Swiss-Prot record:
Gene3D superfamilies on file: Aldolase class I
Catalytic activity: 1-(2-carboxyphenylamino)-1-deoxy-D-ribulose 5-phosphate + H(+) = (1S,2R)-1-C-(indol-3-yl)glycerol 3-phosphate + CO2 + H2O
Protein name in the entry: Indole-3-glycerol phosphate synthase
Pfam families xrefs: IGPS
Pathway(s) per entry: Amino-acid biosynthesis; L-tryptophan biosynthesis; L-tryptophan from chorismate: step 4/5
UniProt family annotation: Belongs to the TrpC family.
Length: 253
């Protein structure tokens, strides 16, 4: 009898653990462009991006500027990130946190939950279609959302018949780090031709620096943008966010 009560209590506790409390998808609203502001110190293509790297200060400024979500690089060797940064910043915000890393094994997904991430990145170029499907299922089962990132036609084809809900279009080719903002439009056109444009929330990633870039992406009706370098290089990212997103300037008043 007591054992049955204990098990029932544990079922209730587990159900609460699985509840999604913070969701990136909730930030996607018609007519609104979601800003995912990234915290990163360096990259293989640019070297050191932020010489006075202070993750907590960066988070505070992103919140002040009106960011809708935060991306945190946790790769140590190539981006000089750390899982500790995510773990330490998690209690300091209620915004969704994306763990930005190269996920190749399920253990990293469980680790992401433990660290406090709400969203993980799955990079189609380094995963098979079967792995993408499996990782999406694991993520959903434990209450994590996932952005599946693609750069070209082959990668887009790979994710079409999976349970992908949030599609990240990387304007940078990770094989040679070349960059073209036009890549977002190109892949959106492919989705349109396939009749699948409305099947996904779409986030444009990389190379977004000026208001003209934001205006261009708004014209494509993407749901969100991920901006890292352009904000990390600024002494005052709040002003930069206001420049890119005039509607967010009211946050400062």
């Amino acid at each position: 009898m007591y054992l049955e009560k204990i098990v029932e209590t544990k079922r209730e506790e587990v159900a609460k653990l699985k509840e999604k409390k913070i969701s990136l998808k909730d930030s996607f609203q018609k007519g609104k462009l979601t800003l995912i502001a990234e915290i990163k110190k360096a990259s293989p293509s640019k070297g050191i991006i932020s010489t006075n790297f202070d993750p907590q200060r960066q988070l505070e400024l992103y919140i002040k500027g009106g960011a809708d979500a935060i991306s945190i690089l946790t790769d140590e060797k190539y981006f000089q990130g750390s899982t500790n940064i995510l773990k330490e910043l998690r209690p300091k915000t209620n915004l969704p946190i994306l763990r930005k890393d190269f996920i190749i094994d399920p253990i990293q997904i469980y680790q992401s939950l433990f660290l406090g991430a709400n969203v993980i990145l799955l990079i189609a170029s380094i995963l098979t279609k079967k792995e993408i499907s499996n990782f999406l299922k694991i993520s959903k089962d434990i209450g994590l959302e996932a952005i599946v990132e693609v750069h070209n036609h082959q990668e887009l084809t790979k994710v079409l018949d999976t349970e992908t809900e949030i599609l990240g279009i990387n304007n940078r080719d990770l094989s040679d780090f070349s960059l073209s903002l036009r890549n977002t439009e190109k892949l959106l056109e492919e989705l349109e031709k396939l009749g699948k444009r409305r099947d996904f929330y779409v986030i444009s990633e990389s190379g977004i620096k000026e208001k003209s870039d934001i205006d261009y992406l708004r014209s494509l009706e993407v749901d969100g943008v991920l901006i890292g370098e352009a904000l990390m290089k600024e002494n005052d990212p709040v002003l930069k966010i206001g420049e890119l997103f005039p509607e967010k300037r009211s946050n400062l008043q």
